[in-house]
Each structure stands twice: as C-alpha cells, then as structure tokens.
Amino acid sequence: MVNLRPDEISSMIRQQIEQFSQQVQFNHVGTVMQVGDGIARVYGLNDVMAGELLEFADGTIGIALNLESDHVGAVLMGDGRNILEGSEVKSSGQIAQVPVGEELLGRVVNALVQPIDGKGGIETKQTRLIESPAPGIVARQSVCEPLQTGITAIDAMIPIGRGQRELIIGDRQTGKTAIALDTIINQKNEDVICVYVAIGQKASSVAAAVNLLATKGAMDYTIVVTANADDAASLQYLAPYTGAAIAEHFMYQGKATLVIYDDLTKQAQAYRQMSLLLRRPPGREAYPGDVFYLHSRLLERAAKLNKELGGGSMTALPIVETQAGDVSAYIPTNVISITDGQIFLSSDLFNAGIRPAINVGISVSRVGSAAQIQSMKKVAGRLKLELAQFDELQAFSQFASDLDKATQMQLARGQRLREVLKQSQASPIPIEEQIAMIYAGVNGWLDKLALEEVQPFLSRVRSELRTSNYPSAVKSKWSEEVEQMLKDVLSKHAQ
C-alpha cells in the first residue's frame, strides 16, 4: 500500500474542491415501452418536439414522429437490437442536421453523412438542417439557363433548365438510372456540383454506379448519398432530404447543383412502412395521407435563386418506377403534378432497340425553349412534330398495303431521325454536335442513306466539325455563316 503524506492528501482534497462545479444539467428522460421493426414507443417524454432527435441507452439515435397523449412514437436510425424495454431514452433538444461542405466531394456517404467508402473520416466545418423550408416566390427567378444532359433526345425536345424539377419515369430496367448518370457525366466542364441519392437499391448497383462515375472522372464534382435496400426504413426515408440539404448548401453559395433521387417510389414505400408501424391511418394503396407532402416539400427545395441571393440553382431529377407502364398510379401521378415535366421511358421502345427509350409523345418539359440555347431552338423546332407524325404514320402503315410517295418519304425520314437520337450509355454528346446531327436529319441530308450508314456518316461529320471554329460559333448564335459551315461539311461527306 502506498504511504501518502498529510500535505499530499490535503492538496488532493483542495484540487477536488476547486474543480467542483455547481452547474446542474437537466435531461428530459423517458422509458421505452415497446420496441421492434425499427419503431420504439417511449413513455415520459412530455416536452419532446416533432422531429426531435432521441438518444437511446445503446447509443442508437431515433426521431420522434408521433406525439400522442400518453407516449411518443419514434423511428430508429438503425436496427435497435440492443434496445431493451424499460431502458432509458434522452431527448436531445435538436432537430436532425448533417455536415455539409466541399469536403464531401468525391465521397460516398450514408443518410447520416457518415462515410462508407473506406477512405477515412470526413471533417466538415458546417452543418445544415436536413429539413429546411423551400425558397419563397420572391427568392426565385424563372428558369433561364440550360442544363445540358448530353442526350440528344432530351436536349432537343425535352430541355431541362437549371432550377427545374424534371421527373424520369418508367418501368424497371428501361434505362432511368442510365439517363441520370449520363447527365452527371456531362457536367464535367460545366461547374455543376452533383448529388446522387440512391434509395433502397442493391449495394452492387450503387457500387457499379460509383465505379462508372469514377471511371469517367465525374466523382471529382459528385457526392453519392446511399440508403441501401438492407438499411432501416428510416434511413431510406431520410436519404433524399440529406441529399437536398447537401445541395442547398452549395446553392446558397451561388453555385449550380444537380440532385438525382433514385428513386422516390422506394422512399414512399419506406415511409408507408414506418407510418403503418406507427399506426397512422392508411389511405389509397395503404400510403398515409401526407405522402404527397412527403415529396412536395422535398422537390420544392429545387429552385433558381434570384441575383440578390447569389443566383445559385438546384436542379432535381427525381426517378419514379411504374408497374407495367401505369402512369396513373398514386405515386407517379403525385410526382408528375409536383414536377415541371416528365421524361417517360417505354419498355416497348427499349426492347425494340431504341435507346434511350424515351417516348417523345407523352414526355414534356414545362419550361420548354426557355432552357435552350438559340441555335438548338432554331434547329430542333421541327423535330418533335416530325417524330409525332412518323409515329402516327407508322401505326397506320401497318394496315395499309400501298402507300403514296410522300408517305413513304415521311416514314423514311422518321426512321432516320430515330437513328439520329439513338445513343449508347455513358457517351454524352456536346450540344454543338447535337445541333449538327439534328440539322442533318430534319433537312433531308440523311434521306438517301441506308439506315445502317446514318451513325457512321454522323460520326465523320462530328469529327470534322470538332476541328473547325463551328463549336464556338454555334454556341453564341445561329447565323447564315454557321448554317453554311454545316452545309459545306455535310455536302463533302454526303458525296
């Protein structure tokens, strides 16, 4: 046993007295009544706020969603296997917030912005509330700048502007994610920060998407937020709001951002699961009554801010999956009514080898030509009409035996325009080359070519135009000189 001198004992006691604090810390503490299926019912937290974070005895975080007269219904941010009935729960006095900032660029994180890519921790200087109000009417300006996707069919006929919400909708395996990833890849030199939110997907699918973005050099300006299929329903519900909060941080700094929610059907299903377990009354298709508000409060955060607020923008590309092409189901109709247009992908077109499988007839952009450069507006005006007439004639020609010359020519033109719009995945086309391809298609330069010769011909034309001063000229303005430049190159290769 160590012998202590009296003066040592007295100095230790003196130190203890000096360090003694009379501060009293108040904690609101409750008790777990019931736990299971990612839901906990807590008794005794009378002063808790809706959406407040709760801390359980095992360190699991929960969110208070149901405030009832005798208990609080909370969703758990984890499996909650170590939470026992009768254990203690503390209220934190805080609403959910996540770290934001440029430190997240190039990283893959979960719905709570914890890194899951094995590249070490992330130290950010700022945080932001997961749920924050959307910009008001005065804070916005109308969409006026184009956001090029690099996909000819979209940039020509269904243009997307910075600050727009454009829905990508279609059955499973029709190329919805491919369009979203191509759009991210095309932002390489455009100074746009991209956030890709994967909700309820297989981990292998997310890994493949991250790998593709990394291969194309797109991870330098991209943040991936993922809540996989095996994650808790609460994390799948939160992931889109986390993505929006990350993008909002950059938007309010005056930067252009692009957010992809892949897909909101899975988020709605996770929210339905949570609501039913919390015993909220079910409505149509067993979804709770506020499922419209679930998506509207998320998508309304996308905006083009006015000059006083820095002129930043958040463009949202939500994805919704349909069953057997049924666009009139509950979630699809909800999201269609919230967004500024939709790109409809058809499984019939996909199976017929037309990729991207965009059904031009029922796809629409409500922003329209305000989100196009002047040259594209000039050239692509006739394209949608020609394709619509072709679709109508093609259906009619299956029943007619003999067709007149004009009808045959129109059918031939439509087939060649379809070839122009075909595009392989992860190979976005610059806007100036798209204009040249469409100009060749609508002005009859491809009419005499066989269908299999269309793509090789266009690729030769594009290669030559790249080396001329055509790209910079066509971006500034459509003029007779630009048109003559195009005609010279087309006639040279048409011989």
From Swiss-Prot:
Main localization (coarse): plastid
Catalytic reactions on record: ATP + H2O + 4 H(+)(in) = ADP + phosphate + 5 H(+)(out)
InterPro entries: ATP_synth_asu-like_sf, ATP_synth_asu_C, ATP_synth_asu_C_sf, ATP_synth_F1_a_nt-bd_dom, ATP_synth_F1_asu, ATPase_a/bsu_AS, ATPase_F1/V1/A1_a/bsu_N, ATPase_F1/V1/A1_a/bsu_N_sf
GO molecular function, one term: ATP binding
EC number: 7.1.2.2
Subcellular location: Plastid, Chloroplast thylakoid membrane
Pfam families xref list: ATP-synt_ab (PF00006), ATP-synt_ab_C (PF00306), ATP-synt_ab_N (PF02874)
Keywords, alphabetical: ATP synthesis, ATP-binding, CF(1), Chloroplast, Hydrogen ion transport, Ion transport, Membrane, Nucleotide-binding, Plastid, Thylakoid, Translocase, Transport
Entry's Gene Ontology cellular component terms: chloroplast thylakoid membrane; proton-transporting ATP synthase complex
Bilayer disposition of the protein: Peripheral membrane protein
Site label Required for activity, positions: S363
UniProt-annotated binding residues for ATP: G170, D171, R172, Q173, T174, G175, K176, T177
Transmembrane segments: none
Function: Produces ATP from ADP in the presence of a proton gradient across the membrane. The alpha chain is a regulatory subunit.
NCBIfam families: atpA, PRK13343.1
PANTHER family recorded: ATP SYNTHASE SUBUNIT ALPHA, MITOCHONDRIAL
Complexes and interactors: F-type ATPases have 2 components, CF(1) - the catalytic core - and CF(0) - the membrane proton channel. CF(1) has five subunits: alpha(3), beta(3), gamma(1), delta(1), epsilon(1). CF(0) has four main subunits: a, b, b' and c.
Recorded family membership: Belongs to the ATPase alpha/beta chains family.
Protein name (record): ATP synthase subunit alpha, chloroplastic
Source organism of the structure: Cyanidioschyzon merolae (strain NIES-3377 / 10D) (Unicellular red alga)
Underlying gene: atpA
